Regions:
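Membrane-helix boundary/interfacial segments in multi-pass membrane proteins
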Residues: 136-143, 298, 310-353
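Start-transfer (signal-anchor) and selected internal transmembrane alpha helices
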Residues: 1-29, 296-297
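Extracytoplasmic
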Residues: 392-571
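Periplasmic/ER-lumenal interhelical loops and adjacent helix-loop junctions
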Residues: 223-287, 341
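Membrane-interface coil-to-helix junctions
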Residues: 21-108, 135, 140-144, 471
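Signature aromatic-anchored transmembrane alpha helix within multi-pass, membrane-resident enzymes
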Residues: 217, 360-395
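Membrane-embedded helix bundles of polyisoprenyl
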Residues: 105-201, 212-229
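Hydrophobic, aromatic-rich transmembrane alpha-helices
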Residues: 273-310, 354, 358-360
Length: 571
């Protein structure tokens, strides 16, 4: 009895210690609360708004969100994770963000730990690799799109091995409802199809893989029906993506970048993983016949993972090289603007699973002292690299030396007290509620205004109306004409439908410490008035305000506020 109890404890203890390690990495968020720092790009300036609006209109049946861009289609602001919307429906935005962050960290650790154990990797190695994986700086706004891939693969493997099917189906559905079809789901479906084809050829696991595919497909279609109808049935207005002009790079530059540096959307610290994995493959190949059966199987798996990493890198570099980009631009449509190269989002899964396999081979095949020395050296290097690049490190820095970090916190970024003061002032002066007029932001992200209840004519969206892009262009046309970079940014891309200036471009992170002054700004305020835009919330003084029929109403600033907002009324 005692022996069985000890075995159960030994089996569960590493997992519980891993949960504690992940929770320790989360503690700075709880200590700092709204003073914690979160990378702004694509999170605070975009996806947080999609969750906020998605939750606000979850049950009202609206096909248009009136808060942004004078009313924008739901397809313009599709949340990457449907289940995360539910968090925002029952919690205020910041607690919802923190809860989602913790869920993503737990899923990352749990999935990688269970997957390695399923493949026969020692629990000590599985523990270390899974903790490192969970500490990678994932963008939690994308839900389980990247961090949850090990959990999905674990569920599929268990399904194919004939384990309890219902939990496997539940995990597959959980992943699909917590991830994005556009960002990674298409690649997941493609991988399941390829696996099913190989299974059919070998007459193994056909039913299980096909079931996993159709379950995943059903989940994604259910969430994205309106978007799929827009793309494939021509429903809705043409997207601004029709005018996107892709920019290519040299093939070798693209290949080197993705294989060595990776990408912020799928962080890996992979430059520290290349040498140990390559060394294991080299020496494992040389001494293959001397290895145990398990090590041979893991060596084959490591080789397969390395091959997939290389193939994905080649595909990414090919899709973005100058010659292919020119062809894509000429063909247009889905071929041009769909980023199929995002299959590199599999990289964290592939790299860290390969690391776990490599460490297990070292542990099993080398003499004990050599194995421990090699393992500690590899884990030490990788662990330090992961820790230094983690969100945990950023927020520990914020706790002790915020003045040297130079990143804005949630509280600073959204500056709720200052924007509440602006809202109250406008309501007292005009009697209008926020839904009765529109605002535009200059030098400040429009997301700040939206999250503070304002209705805007500007926003960050990767799929809004082409007609609206043309209408908005009238507002900033003169500033575009004065800057080739502005033209490239708006005309050839245009996801950030923002006010801009020739002096500062589309930069929109200006706190009061920058002392911004717009010396020669020329905006078409008549076009803004046609959109019912009554006010500009500017990060700096506009010296040409009178020439544009702008009246400075008031300057809003508090001692502890991040912004200094110049409120201009359009006359």
């Amino acid at each position: 009895m005692r022996h069985e109890t000890k075995q159960n404890v030994n089996r569960v203890l590493p997992f519980l210690l891993g949960i504690l390690a992940v929770t320790a990495g989360y503690l700075p968020y709880l200590v700092l609360r709204e003073n914690c720092v979160i990378p702004v790009s694509d999170q605070l300036d975009g996806e947080i708004v999609t969750y906020y609006l998605g939750a606000k209109h979850l049950f009202d049946g609206r096909s248009v969100f009136p808060e942004v861009m004078c009313g924008v289609s739901r397809n313009a602001l599709i949340p990457p994770s449907f289940l995360t919307v539910l968090f925002y429906a029952v919690l205020p935005p910041f607690p919802a963000f923190l809860f989602n962050q913790y869920c993503v960290l737990l899923a990352a650790f749990t999935g990688m730990y269970l997957l390695q154990k399923e493949l026969g990797i020692d629990v000590k190695i599985a523990f270390c690799v899974a903790v490192f994986f969970a500490y990678l700086p994932f963008y939690s706004v994308y839900g389980l799109s990247v961090a949850g891939l090990p959990l999905l693969v674990y569920a599929v493997i268990r399904l194919c091995r004939g384990r309890k099917k219902l939990p496997c189906y539940a995990l597959i559905a959980l992943y699909c409802f917590s991830s994005s079809l556009v960002l990674i789901g298409y690649a997941v479906l493609g991988a399941l199809v390829l696996a099913a084809v190989f299974a059919i050829a070998k007459r193994k696991y056909r039913k299980e893989l096909l079931t996993a595919f159709f379950l995943s497909l059903a989940c994604y279609v259910l969430q994205n029906m309106s978007l799929l109808l827009q793309v494939f049935a021509g429903n809705g207005e043409p997207s601004h993506k029709e005018e996107i002009v892709l920019q290519g790079v040299r093939f070798l530059d693209g290949l080197k970048g993705i294989l060595w540096e990776g990408n912020a959307y799928a962080p890996t610290c992979q430059k520290y993983l290349v040498i140990p994995i390559a060394a294991v493959l080299l020496f494992g190949g040389i001494f293959y016949k001397r290895c145990s059966t398990q090590s041979r199987n893991l060596l084959k798996l490591t080789g397969l993972l390395a091959g997939l990493i290389l193939l994905i890198g080649l595909f990414y570099a090919s899709a973005n090289c100058n010659a292919v980009v020119q062809i894509r631009n000429q063909i247009g449509g889905l071929v041009k603007y769909f980023q199929a190269d995002r299959i590199y989002w599999f990289y964290p899964l592939l790299w860290y699973l390969a690391l776990g396999c490599a460490l297990q081979i070292i542990y099993a095949e080398l003499p004990r002292v050599c194995a421990w020395c090699a393992g500690i050296a590899v884990l030490g290097c990788v662990g330090i690299a992961v820790l230094l690049g983690s969100n945990f490190k950023l927020n520990v820095h914020q706790m002790f030396k915020p003045e040297t970090l130079k990143m804005v916190s949630w509280e600073q970024y959204f500056d709720e007290a200052l924007y509440a003061e602006i809202m109250e002032y406008i309501e007292e002066e005009t009697g209008m509620t926020q839904s009765e007029y529109r605002v535009a932001s200059l030098g400040i992200q429009p997301a700040v205004a939206v999250m503070n209840g304002f209705y805007t004519i500007d926003m960050y969206s990767n799929n809004y109306s082409l007609a609206y892009k043309h209408a908005f262009r009238r507002i900033i046309e003169r500033e575009l004409d004065r800057s080739a970079l502005n033209i490239l940014y708006f005309d050839d891309w245009g996801n950030r439908c923002y006010l801009c200036s020739a002096e500062y471009g589309f930069a929109s992170y200006f706190g009061k410490q920058y002392g911004i002054v717009y010396h020669s700004l020329e905006l078409n305020t008549e076009a803004m008035a046609e959109m019912n835009c009554k006010y500009i919330l500017s990060a700096g003084e506009i010296q040409t305000a009178e020439e544009m029929n702008l009246c400075l109403e008031r300057i809003f600033e508090e001692e502890d506020s991040y912004y200094r907002v110049y409120l201009y009324r359009i006359e």
